[in-house]
C-alpha cells in the first residue's frame, strides 16, 4: 500500500498483469498440459465451458454433440473437465462400477427444499429410497395398481371417441394428459382430472417450465452466482419453478393428512414400511421424491408415445403391419389389458426402435470419475473428470447402427443387415443400480395406450397443420424434449 492507504503503483501493475495473463495462461494449460489434453474436441470447448453452457441454454446441446462426435469420433472433450462417449463399452464403467461413480452435481436439477430426491441422492440415500419405493414399481406392485392405470387409459379412449369428430387432435397433448392422470392416481391416489376436464393441469406447465430453467440454474450454480438469477432470470420460468415446488408440497401434505388410510398409491407401501435400522422417509424427502416421480412418470412416457406415433405415421407400412397384428389378436376391446398386450407380435420391437430414435431423456446423467482414475472404453480418464454416454447421439451413430436414422423395427431381431448393430448401446432407462425405477410402469403404459389407440382408431397425419414439418427434428432439448403439437386425424375403425 502507498502512504495514503491506496494500492501502490507496483500492486496496480501486478493486478493488471495478472488480469491480462491469466486467461491466456489458463487456455494454454488446458490445451497443452491438462490431463485431458490428448482427447479430441473443439479447442474453444476445451478452453472454457462457455460454448457448452450457451448451447445447453438454447436447447441445442444434444445436436451440437452429435455434430462434434461426427467430426471428432467416439470420445470427445466437450468442456475443460468433461468427456462425452458414444461407445457401448463406456456404459459399464460409468454406470455400473462398484464403488459407483457419483453423479455430477452440476448436471443434476437443483432441489428447492435442500433435500435431494431419488434422482440426485448420494449412494446411501438412493439405496434407501429405492428400497422404500421398490414394491410400488415392481411387477407385483403394478398388478395391484393395474385397475388405476387401465381406468385412465379407458377414459383416454372414450374422450378420443367423443372429440375426434371435431377435427384433428394434438395427440402429444392427449398423451400428456393421460400419463399425468395416471401418475396422479399412482403418486397421490387421485387423478389430476386432465382427461375428465379436457384441459391441461397447471402443474404440467410448471413442470415443463421448471425443466427449461434447469440449464440456466446449473450455469449460475457452477459459478456461484445463484443470487443473480433472481435479477437476471426469466420471471415466467422462475414463477413456474416456484409453482412446481408448491404443487408438490401441497399434494404431499394432503397425502400425509390421510397417512393412516390406504389409497392404493405408491405411498401406501412407503408409509407402511418400518425400515430395520433406517429412518422412514421424511416429509421433505417425500416432497423431493414426489417431484421426481411425477416428472419421470408422466412426461417421459408421453414423450415416447408421441415419438412412436410420429414414427409410425411417417412409416405407414410399419403402422399398417402393427395395426393389423393388433386387430387380428383381439376380437373385442375387453380382451386388451396390461397382460395381453405384451404378446402382440412386433410391438416390443416398435417400442425399442422408437426409444432408440427418440429416447425420452436424450442425455444420460453425468458421473464423476473417482480420484484414483479409471479406464473407460480403453482409455485412461483421470479422477475428477465428468463423463457421460450420450444416448441420442450414440443411437444415431453409424458406428453403432446400420442405417441409423431410419425407423426399422426389424433391426431388433438382430439378423441380416442388422446383425452387427450394437443394440446394447440403446439404454433409454439407463443401467446399473441407478437405472429407472419406473421402467416397468413405462412399458405397461406405452404398450396399453398404443395397442388400444390402434385397435380403436385409424390414424392419419393432418397434412394441413403438419405440412413440411419434421416434427422430431424441430424440437429443442432442455434435458427433455420440447414437444410440439402432433396433429393427427382419428377415425373410429369400422368394426
UniProtKB/Swiss-Prot annotation:
Q: Does the keyword Ubl conjugation apply?
A: no
Give the protein family: Belongs to the cytochrome P450 family.
- Residue ranges annotated as coiled coil are none
A Gene Ontology molecular function term of the record: monooxygenase activity
| Official protein name in the record | Averantin hydroxylase
Keywords for this protein: Glycoprotein, Heme, Iron, Membrane, Metal-binding, Monooxygenase, Oxidoreductase, Transmembrane, Transmembrane helix
| Induction context | Expression is regulated by the aflatoxin biosynthesis gene cluster transcription factor aflR that binds weakly to the sequence 5'-TCGCAGCCCGG-3' at position -110.
List where in the cell it is found. Membrane
Instruction: Quote the EC number.
Output: 1.14.14.116
Per the record, the GO terms for biological process are: aflatoxin biosynthetic process
**Functional description taken from the UniProt entry:** Averantin hydroxylase; part of the gene cluster that mediates the biosynthesis of aflatoxins, a group of polyketide-derived furanocoumarins, and part of the most toxic and carcinogenic compounds among the known mycotoxins. The four major aflatoxins produced by A.parasiticus are aflatoxin B1 (AFB1), aflatoxin B2 (AFB2), aflatoxin G1 (AFG1) and aflatoxin G2 (AFG2). Within the aflatoxin pathway, the cytochrome P450 monooxygenase aflG catalyzes the hydroxylation of AVN to 5'hydroxyaverantin (HAVN).
Q: How does it sit in the membrane?
A: Single-pass membrane protein
- Which pathway is it part of? Mycotoxin biosynthesis; aflatoxin biosynthesis
Q: Which residues cross the membrane?
A: 12-32
Catalytic activities: (1'S)-averantin + reduced [NADPH--hemoprotein reductase] + O2 = (1'S,5'R)-5'-hydroxyaverantin + oxidized [NADPH--hemoprotein reductase] + H2O; (1'S)-averantin + reduced [NADPH--hemoprotein reductase] + O2 = (1'S,5'S)-5'-hydroxyaverantin + oxidized [NADPH--hemoprotein reductase] + H2O + H(+)
Q: Which PANTHER family match?
A: CYTOCHROME P450, CYTOCHROME P450 MONOOXYGENASE ASQL-RELATED
Co-factor(s): heme
Amino acid at each position: 500500500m502507498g502512504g495514503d492507504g491506496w494500492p501502490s503503483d507496483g500492486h496496480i501493475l501486478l493486478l493488471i498483469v495478472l488480469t491480462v495473463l491469466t486467461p491466456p495462461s489458463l487456455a494454454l494449460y488446458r490445451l497443452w498440459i491438462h490431463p485431458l489434453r490428448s482427447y479430441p474436441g473443439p479447442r474453444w470447448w476445451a478452453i472454457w465451458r462457455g460454448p457448452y453452457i450457451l448451447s445447453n441454454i438454447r436447447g441445442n446441446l444434444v445436436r451440437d454433440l452429435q455434430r462434434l462426435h461426427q467430426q471428432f469420433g467416439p470420445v470427445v472433450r466437450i468442456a475443460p473437465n468433461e468427456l462425452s462417449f458414444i461407445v457401448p463399452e463406456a456404459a459399464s464403467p460409468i454406470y455400473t462400477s462398484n464403488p459407483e461413480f457419483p453423479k455430477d452435481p452440476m448436471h443434476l436439477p437443483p432441489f428447492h427444499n435442500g433435500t435431494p430426491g431419488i434422482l440426485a441422492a448420494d449412494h446411501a440415500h438412493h439405496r434407501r429410497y429405492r428400497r422404500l419405493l421398490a414394491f410400488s414399481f415392481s411387477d407385483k406392485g403394478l398388478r395391484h395398481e393395474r385397475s388405476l392405470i387401465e381406468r385412465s387409459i379407458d377414459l383416454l379412449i372414450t374422450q378420443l371417441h367423443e372429440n375426434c369428430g371435431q377435427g384433428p387432435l394434438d395427440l402429444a397433448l392427449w398423451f400428456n394428459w393421460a400419463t399425468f392422470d395416471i401418475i396422479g392416481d399412482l403418486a397421490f391416489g387421485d387423478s389430476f382430472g386432465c382427461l375428465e376436464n379436457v384441459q391441461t393441469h397447471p402443474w404440467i406447465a410448471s413442470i415443463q417450465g421448471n425443466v427449461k430453467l434447469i440449464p440456466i440454474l446449473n450455469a449460475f450454480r457452477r459459478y456461484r452466482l445463484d443470487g443473480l438469477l433472481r435479477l437476471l432470470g426469466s420471471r415466467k420460468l422462475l414463477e413456474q419453478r416456484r409453482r412446481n415446488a408448491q404443487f408438490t408440497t401441497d399434494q404431499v401434505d394432503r397425502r400425509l393428512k390421510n397417512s393412516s388410510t390406504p389409497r392404493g398409491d405408491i405411498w401406501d407401501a412407503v408409509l407402511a414400511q418400518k425400515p430395520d435400522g433406517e429412518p422412514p422417509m421424511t416429509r421433505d424427502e417425500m416432497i423431493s421424491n414426489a417431484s421426481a416421480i411425477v416428472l419421470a412418470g408422466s412426461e417421459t412416457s408421453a414423450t415416447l408415445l408421441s415419438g412412436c406415433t410420429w414414427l409410425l405415421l411417417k412409416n405407414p407400412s410399419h403402422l399398417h403391419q402393427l395395426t393389423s397384428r393388433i386387430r387380428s389378436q383381439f376380437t373385442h376391446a375387453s380382451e386388451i389389458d396390461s397382460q395381453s398386450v405384451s404378446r402382440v407380435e412386433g410391438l416390443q420391437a416398435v417400442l425399442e426402435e422408437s426409444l432408440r430414435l427418440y429416447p425420452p431423456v436424450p442425455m444420460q446423467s453425468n458421473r464423476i470419475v473417482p480420484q484414483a482414475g479409471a479406464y473407460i472404453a480403453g482409455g485412461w480418464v483421470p479422477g475428477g473428470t465428468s463423463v457421460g454416454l450420450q444416448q441420442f447421439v450414440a443411437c444415431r451413430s453409424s458406428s453403432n447402427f446400420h442405417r441409423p436414422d431410419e425407423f426399422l423395427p426389424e433391426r431388433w431381431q438382430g439378423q441380416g443387415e442388422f446383425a452387427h448393430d450394437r443394440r446394447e448401446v440403446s439404454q433409454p432407462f439407463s443401467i446399473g443400480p441407478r437405472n429407472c425405477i419406473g421402467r416397468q410402469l413405462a412399458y405397461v403404459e406405452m404398450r396399453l395406450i398404443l395397442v388400444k389407440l390402434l385397435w380403436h382408431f385409424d390414424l392419419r397425419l393432418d397434412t394441413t397443420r403438419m405440412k413440411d414439418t419434421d416434427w422430431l427434428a424441430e424440437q429443442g432439448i432442455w434435458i427433455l424434449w420440447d414437444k410440439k403439437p402432433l396433429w393427427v386425424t382419428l377415425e373410429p375403425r369400422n368394426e
